[in-house]
């Protein structure tokens, strides 16, 4: 009976996700961010021109390839539009990540499923999950690797399973190497299995190289033929991020504000009240999640743009708190309620001069549309000219990369 009752949380979350997914499916809108369209442009340049032009440095080859193939196949004629096919694929990823998070909660001592709902009903979780972007697929493989090392450690050939999962996660997004670092530290410090650490590290790096090198070699070949680069060392520019010309204060402002967006203003205040007396020690069970949280936060501080990059940190932090005792249940329920409501209506206590830089912040209380509603309207407006965005992303990416790295 307990298993049936506990699984209700997972089923309920999937039903809510489905309800919120349907409007986007009907409208066939793949996202409010240009990056969603850039993925298609990357695939078309590779498929039609024979040149790999990353949608963003340093490239996201596995996800770009998957999205491009789905788009191309459905473009030839199907009951579904290409956009609907991509959205259905993305929805399955949401269900899979929901289940992985649910399993972590279910394996914990406290089994606090309200934290599970707090994770999966966060506006940034729902928006990222409903957008054609790489965050969810990369997180799925990363957290599967964590699940294996925590709960399937005695499996035969675990180093091979870990290497495959981690290399897939890294092949989707290079910054997911943080999952590898956290797992290696855990195996070394708590399991003291240095052989497993070495095997996992070496095999993961080899497999990751097999994923990235063919695409990078394609781009380097183009540069050498056109006398743009003469040495492979010049390709290190692929690791440089774009749009980093902001002051530390600018980045810090954006960094702080985007943390709030996971809960909404009221939800964030309630969350701080909830955890203000929380005390926890780093243990074998939560060490990996602490490392994931810290390293992804530092990575985000370098370029605090899309909140989706913080999803592993957000999930990890709440998984740590979910296994702690003596939380005020009323405040936790209130936090969950207002976090979910912030998808539809949000109470702002500040305004910024620019969403992207947030260099000037003023106190200004107002009630605004929620994050999910704002994203829904924006993606609908962008989709009105989706054919333009597909073609424009292809030409824009080619122009950006044809003379060398754009950064």
Annotated model-derived regions:
Residues 2, 14, 188, 257-287, ...:
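Hydrophobic, aromatic-rich transmembrane alpha-helices
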Residues 172, 178, 303-328:
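Hydrophobic/aromatic-rich transmembrane helices and adjacent perimembrane loops
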Residues 197-250, 256-267, 342-346:
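Membrane-lumen/periplasm interface segments of specific transmembrane helices
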């Amino acid at each position: 009976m307990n298993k049936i009752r506990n699984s209700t949380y997972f089923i309920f979350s999937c039903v809510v996700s489905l309800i919120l997914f349907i409007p986007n499916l009907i409208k066939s809108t793949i996202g409010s961010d240009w990056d969603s369209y850039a993925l298609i442009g990357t695939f078309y340049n590779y498929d039609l021109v024979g040149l790999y032009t990353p949608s963003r440095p340093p490239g996201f080859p596995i996800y770009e390839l998957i999205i491009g193939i789905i788009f191309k196949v459905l473009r030839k004629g199907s009951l579904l539009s290409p956009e609907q096919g991509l959205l259905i694929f993305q929805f399955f990823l949401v269900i899979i990540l929901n289940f992985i998070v649910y399993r972590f909660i279910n394996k914990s001592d406290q089994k606090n499923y309200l934290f599970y709902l707090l994770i999966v009903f966060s506006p940034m979780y729902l928006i990222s999950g409903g957008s054609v972007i790489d965050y969810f697929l990369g997180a799925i493989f990363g957290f599967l690797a964590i699940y294996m090392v925590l709960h399937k450690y005695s499996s035969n050939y675990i180093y091979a399973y870990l290497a495959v999962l981690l290399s897939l996660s890294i092949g989707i997004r290079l910054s997911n190497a943080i999952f590898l670092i956290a797992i290696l530290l855990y195996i070394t410090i708590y399991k003291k299995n240095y052989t497993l650490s070495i095997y996992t590290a070496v095999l993961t790096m080899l497999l990751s190289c097999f994923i990235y090198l063919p695409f990078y070699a394609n781009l380097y070949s183009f540069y050498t033929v056109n006398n743009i680069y003469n040495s492979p060392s010049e390709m290190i520019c692929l690791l440089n991020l774009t749009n980093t010309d902001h002051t530390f204060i600018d980045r810090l402002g954006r960094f702080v504000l985007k943390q709030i967006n996971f809960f909404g203003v009221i939800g964030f205040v309630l969350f701080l009240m909830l955890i203000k007396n929380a005390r926890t020690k780093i243990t074998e069970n939560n060490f990996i999640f602490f490392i994931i949280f810290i390293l992804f936060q530092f990575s985000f501080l370098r370029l605090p743009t899309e909140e989706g990059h913080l999803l592993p940190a957000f999930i990890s932090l709440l998984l740590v708190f979910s296994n702690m005792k003596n939380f005020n249940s009323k405040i936790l329920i209130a936090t969950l309620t207002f976090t979910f409501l912030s998808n539809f209506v949000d109470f702002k206590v500040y305004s910024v001069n620019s969403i992207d830089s947030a260099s000037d912040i003023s106190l200004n209380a107002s009630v605004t549309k929620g994050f999910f509603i704002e994203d829904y309207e924006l993606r609908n407006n962008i989709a009105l000219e989706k054919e333009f965005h597909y073609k424009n992303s292809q030409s824009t990416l080619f122009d950006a990369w044809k003379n060398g790295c754009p950064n």
